[in-house]
C-alpha cells in the first residue's frame, strides 16, 4: 500500500504538494487539442494502457466511438492517441477538501487521515465531469475500470446527467470492488458475476462474453509438454528484495531454464541492477509488449496477485502463485489458488519443487481450469468474444433514445 499512499505523513504531504503543482496548476497551462469530435459520441473512458488495449476493439468496430481520458492521465504508449477531458477547473473545488476530510473522519475514523493524499486527489473530479457531460452530451460512456477515483466520479456524474453507462471487464475482479452499477455490464465469466454479487446489489443488465482481449491468442495455446521458459510478472506491491531473492534462487537452481522478468507498466522502479547482476535474465517491457505476446514466449508463469495468471492459463501456460514479500495487502486476492486455477508455493524450495514437476511434464489441457473465468471457453464462441461484445453493445445503444440536443 505504501506504493499507492506512503506510510510517512511527510511523504504523503510531499505527494499532495507534487500533485497540486504538476496536475492542478500544471493543467491550467496545458493546452488540449482533441483530434476527434466528442460531442454526441460514445465515449470509451480509459485510465491506463491496459484499459486502452481492452477497449480499442470497440473503437475499431463502432465508428461513433472515441477513446477518452482525463487531462494528464498516463496511458503509457497511447498517451498521444486518446482525447482528453479538461481538468483545469478541478482546482476551483479544493475549498471542499477540509469538509470532505472531516466528514470521512467521522465515518471512517483514522483511515481518513491515513489516506488524506488519496482523498486530496479525488476532489473536484465529479464537478468537472458533470460540466463536461452537460457540454458534450455523449450518447453513452463505456468503462473498463470501475474503481479508480476518476472513473467512479465519471460514473456518478453520468447518473446525475442521465448518460447511459456500460462496463467491459478488462481484468479479474475481487470481492473488494464497488458494487456493479452500470446500465450494461459485459463480464468475462461466472467468477466475475459471483464476486460482484458479494460486493453488493447488481444494477442493470449483465451479459457474460468471455475475454475480448484474448480472442486473437486463444488459438495459439502452448502445447509444449515441458517447461523451458519461465516468466515472472511483478507489480508495485511486490518487494524489490523479495524479487531479487527469488531470481537469485531460480537462476542458481535452474540454469537450463530461461527466465524473463516483466514489471507492471505502472511500476517506476529501476531494475537495471538485475541486468548487471544476472546477465542471463531477460526482460519484457510491459509498455511495449502486449501481455499475451509475453505469455506466448513462456511455458510457465510465476507471479503473486495479478490477472496475468488467468491470461497465462488461457494459453495453457502453467500458473504458479508465489508472493514476493510479506506485505498484508493481498493474499490470493483474485481467488485463483482457491478455485484451482493456480498452484501455490509458500517458499522458494516449494516453488522449486513445483517448477521441477512442470519441467518434467506440463499437461496440454491446463486451459480447461479457466472455464469458470471465461464464459466462451470450450463453446462455439471461443475466440469470438469481441464480436459478441460489440453486438451486445450495438443492440443496447440502438435500444436507447438519442439524447436531446
Please tell me what each predicted stretch does.
Residues 105-110, 145-148, 255-287, 330:
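Catalytic donor nucleotide-activated moiety binding site of glycosyltransferases and closely related
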Residues 266-310, 314-315, 319, 326:
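Donor nucleotide-activated moiety binding/catalytic core segment of transferases
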Residues 182, 203-204, 208, 307-378:
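Catalytic binding pocket for nucleotide-activated donors in carbohydrate/polymer assembly enzymes
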Residues 1-15, 348-405:
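C-terminal amphipathic helix plus adjacent low-complexity
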Amino acid at each position: 500500500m505504501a506504493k499507492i499512499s506512503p506510510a510517512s505523513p511527510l511523504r504523503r504531504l510531499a505527494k499532495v504538494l507534487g500533485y497540486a503543482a504538476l496536475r492542478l496548476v500544471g493543467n491550467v497551462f496545458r493546452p488540449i487539442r482533441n483530434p476527434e469530435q466528442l460531442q454526441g459520441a460514445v465515449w470509451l473512458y480509459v485510465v491506463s494502457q491496459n484499459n486502452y488495449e481492452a477497449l480499442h476493439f470497440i473503437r475499431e468496430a463502432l465508428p461513433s466511438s472515441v477513446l477518452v481520458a482525463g487531462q494528464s492521465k498516463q496511458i503509457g504508449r497511447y498517451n498521444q492517441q486518446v482525447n482528453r477531458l479538461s481538468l483545469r477547473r478541478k482546482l476551483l473545488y479544493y475549498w471542499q477538501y477540509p469538509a470532505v476530510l472531516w466528514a470521512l473522519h467521522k465515518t471512517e475514523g483514522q483511515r481518513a487521515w491515513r489516506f488524506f493524499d488519496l482523498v486530496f486527489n479525488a476532489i473536484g473530479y465529479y464537478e468537472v465531469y458533470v460540466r463536461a457531460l452537460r457540454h458534450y452530451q455523449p450518447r453513452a460512456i463505456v468503462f473498463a475500470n470501475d474503481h479508480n477515483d476518476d472513473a467512479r466520479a465519471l460514473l456518478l456524474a453520468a447518473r446525475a446527467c442521465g448518460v447511459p453507462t456500460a462496463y467491459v471487464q478488462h481484468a479479474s475482479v475481487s470481492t473488494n470492488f464497488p458494487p456493479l452499477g452500470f446500465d450494461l455490464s459485459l463480464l468475462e465469466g461466472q467468477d466475475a458475476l459471483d464476486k460482484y454479487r458479494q460486493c453488493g446489489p447488481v444494477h442493470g443488465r449483465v451479459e457474460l462474453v468471455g475475454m475480448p482481449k484474448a480472442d486473437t491468442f486463444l488459438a495459439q495455446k502452448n502445447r509444449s509438454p515441458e517447461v523451458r521458459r519461465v516468466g515472472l510478472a511483478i507489480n508495485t506491491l511486490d518487494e524489490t528484495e523479495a524479487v531479487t531473492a527469488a531470481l537469485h534462487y531460480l537462476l542458481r537452481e535452474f540454469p537450463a531454464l530461461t527466465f524473463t522478468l516483466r514489471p507492471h507498466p505502472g511500476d517506476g522502479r529501476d531494475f537495471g541492477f538485475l541486468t548487471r547482476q544476472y546477465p542471463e535474465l531477460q526482460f519484457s517491457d510491459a509498455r511495449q509488449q502486449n501481455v499475451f505476446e509475453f505469455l506466448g514466449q513462456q511455458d510457465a508463469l510465476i507471479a503473486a496477485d495479478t490477472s496475468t495468471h488467468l491470461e497465462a492459463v488461457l494459453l495453457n501456460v502453467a500458473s504458479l502463485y508465489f508472493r514476493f514479500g510479506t506485505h498484508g495487502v493481498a493474499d490470493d486476492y483474485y481467488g485463483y489458488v482457491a478455485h484451482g486455477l493456480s498452484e501455490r508455493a509458500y517458499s522458494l524450495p516449494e516453488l522449486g519443487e513445483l517448477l521441477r514437476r512442470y519441467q518434467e511434464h506440463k499437461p496440454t489441457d491446463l486451459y480447461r481450469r479457466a472455464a469458470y473465468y471465461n464464459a466462451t471457453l470450450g463453446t462455439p464462441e471461443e475466440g469470438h468474444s469481441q464480436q459478441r461484445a460489440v453486438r451486445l453493445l450495438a443492440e443496447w445503444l440502438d435500444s436507447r433514445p438519442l439524447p436531446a440536443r
